[in-house]
């Protein structure tokens, strides 16, 4: 009995560590043996990519403690919102974050899109609250851009024989990161594709078709209606 309890405790500890460092989905896959290079599965998902504004310039002038505090506040806002909405954070990349919201059985596409958008908005609101505390403490406020798309991705292990990474790859992943790069020049905190916008009602508004690096045709983009409408009224 003692050995069984020890094994159960070991598995709980391993699951906690894997979930913390890899995310719930990848942690579950690795714990259940999906650790070979090339292990993969295809899935339809909403892809979310976020990036902290002006990180490079700030990193050059902030102390290490200031930088870590900023990243912690930014990532905490995103991770909490994404997790509550049923998403999976897959990767932190400096000041970037990649997450997916897997689409379940037929009929759940619209709900998944709505949850992903709600997560992005909730993260924005959470960071606004954190910014009030930062400003009160004499620290600079933080802003981030986020992009959303829907597409089929490959979810699994990639890398070399001695080092693997559990992640998602595919055209939709590349597209969403390039769309996010347009948030700042377009003056929008959030941008989404038509593939996602059609499932969230009037929460998003069109902001035109824009050139995306690597694509031959412009891509129709949508932004938060609550942000677009006041901007148009004041134009």
Where are the language model's segments positioned?
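Conserved, well-folded catalytic cores of nucleic-acid-processing
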Residues: 20, 24, 123-126, 130, ...
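Regulatory cytosolic signal-relay segments
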Residues: 1-42
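Catalytic/regulatory signature loops of cyclic-dinucleotide turnover enzymes
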Residues: 149-150, 158-159, 171-194, 215
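Catalytic NTP-binding/metal-coordinating core of nucleotidyl cyclase/transferase enzymes
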Residues: 34-118
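Cytosolic regulatory/linker segments at or just downstream of nucleotide-handling modules
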Residues: 182-235
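A structural signal for short, well-ordered beta-strand segments
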Residues: 47, 97, 144-150, 221
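Catalytic strand-loop-helix junctions within cyclic-nucleotide turnover domains
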Residues: 100-111, 146-166, 183-186
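Alpha-helical scaffold within the catalytic cores of cyclic-nucleotide enzymes
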Residues: 72-86, 103, 107-146, 171-180
């Amino acid at each position: 009995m003692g050995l069984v309890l020890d094994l159960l405790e070991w598995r709980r500890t391993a699951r906690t560590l894997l979930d913390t460092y890899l995310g719930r989905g990848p942690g579950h896959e690795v714990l259940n043996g999906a650790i070979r290079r090339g292990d993969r599965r295809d899935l339809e998902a909403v892809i979310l990519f976020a990036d902290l504004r002006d990180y490079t310039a700030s990193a050059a002038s902030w102390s290490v403690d200031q930088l870590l505090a900023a990243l912690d506040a930014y990532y905490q806002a995103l991770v909490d919102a994404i997790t509550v909405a049923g998403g999976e954070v897959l990767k932190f990349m400096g000041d970037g974050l990649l997450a997916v919201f897997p689409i379940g059985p037929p009929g759940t596409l619209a709900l998944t899109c709505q949850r992903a958008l709600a997560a992005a908005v909730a993260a924005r609101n959470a960071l606004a609250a954190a910014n009030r505390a930062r400003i009160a403490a004499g620290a600079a406020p933080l802003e981030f851009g986020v992009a959303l798309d829907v597409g089929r991705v490959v979810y699994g292990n990639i890398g070399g024989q001695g080092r693997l990474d559990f992640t998602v790859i595919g055209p939709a992943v590349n597209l969403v990161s390039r769309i996010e790069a347009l948030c700042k020049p377009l003056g929008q905190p959030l941008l989404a594709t038509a593939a996602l916008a059609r499932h969230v009602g009037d929460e998003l508004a069109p902001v035109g078709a824009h050139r995306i690096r690597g694509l031959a045709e412009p891509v129709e983009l949508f932004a938060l209606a609550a942000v677009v409408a006041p901007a148009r009224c004041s134009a």
